[in-house]
Regions:
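Conserved ABC transporter NBD signature motif
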Residues: 58-66, 78, 111-116, 216-218
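The feature captures the beta-strand-to-loop junction immediately N-terminal to the Walker
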Residues: 35-37
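Conserved beta-strand-loop-alpha-helix hinge in the C-terminal portion
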Residues: 213-233
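ABC ATPase C-loop
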Residues: 150-151
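Helix-to-loop junction immediately C-terminal to a conserved catalytic motif
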Residues: 50
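Conserved ABC ATPase signature
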Residues: 133-137, 141
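ABC-type ATPase nucleotide-binding domains, specifically the catalytic core motifs of the NBD
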Residues: 14, 70, 95-114, 122-124, ...
């Protein structure tokens, strides 16, 4: 059984259809990416999974349980963490306070304090900034903070939407290293990433989404000529 199963999902914003029957799966501990042009429906699909946008038809299941009709915070409590596009920090709160909010559904006790210590071990720069307000952090540090905050819920699955957006190349590369390390430690990841080249290299499998439809799925999509031409600017050998 897949950890996450999406089947023939359609969704709209008013009269505008955004998804036209998207299907995908994420297995336990798997890193899967979605690539496609802006407006293809990738972010909308993540919002459907999290209950932020209702599905018109189709099914979304997590560990065999339907997510359709569930409230977002109830979905999060099942073990799904969503890191949306952009800097989602609470800028006037400290790094420590932001991280504690990530465990909002859990009792603050020795276990959650231990989880905080383990999360901070992954992000040593946040230890140095622990009492700073989040709004004073650099863009890369803020992105690390929102991922760290999501980890405080101890998720089985993370939905990451454009985690490298707006980051300098070296910081983006560090972000990809963090994502790989999280996945290697057992956290499943569904990744939407503007840098299709990096995303397809990181992921075990990938999906191409066009105009709200799943048009291609498989391993080694970075070797597919159609994907190369559409999203990677031609042969990787030329890079």
């Amino acid at each position: 059984m897949s950890l996450l199963s999406v089947r023939d999902v359609t969704a709209s914003y008013g009269k505008v259809m955004a998804l036209h029957g998207v299907t995908l799966n994420v297995g336990r501990g798997e890193l899967v990416c979605m690539v496609g042009a802006n407006g293809a429906g990738k972010t909308t699909l993540m919002k459907v999974i999290m209950g932020l946008v209702p599905a018109a038809t189709g099914s979304v299941e997590f560990e065999g349980r339907s997510l359709l009709g569930m409230r977002t915070h109830d979905i999060a409590q099942l073990g799904i963490a969503y890191v949306p596009e952009g800097r989602g920090t609470l800028s006037e709160l400290s790094v420590r306070e932001n991280l504690r909010l990530g465990a909002f559904s859990r009792r603050w006790n020795a276990e959650t304090r231990g989880d905080l210590e383990r999360v901070l071990e992954r992000f040593p720069i946040l230890v140095e900034r622990i009492d700073q307000t989040a709004g004073t952090l650099s863009g890369g540090e803020q992105q690390m903070l929102v991922i760290a905050r999501a980890l405080m819920s101890c998720p089985q699955l993370m939905l990451l939407d454009e985690p490298s957006l707006g980051l300098a190349p070296l910081i983006a590369a560090r972000m990809f290293e963090i994502i790989t390390a999280l996945n290697e430690q057992g956290v499943a990841v569904l990744l939407v990433e503007q840098n299709a080249h990096a995303a397809l290299r990181l992921a075990k499998r990938g999906y191409v989404i066009e105009l709200g439809c799943t048009v291609l799925e498989g391993e080694n999509l970075s070797e597919n000529e159609g994907v190369l031409d559409a999203y990677l600017g031609g042969s990787l050998a030329a890079r």
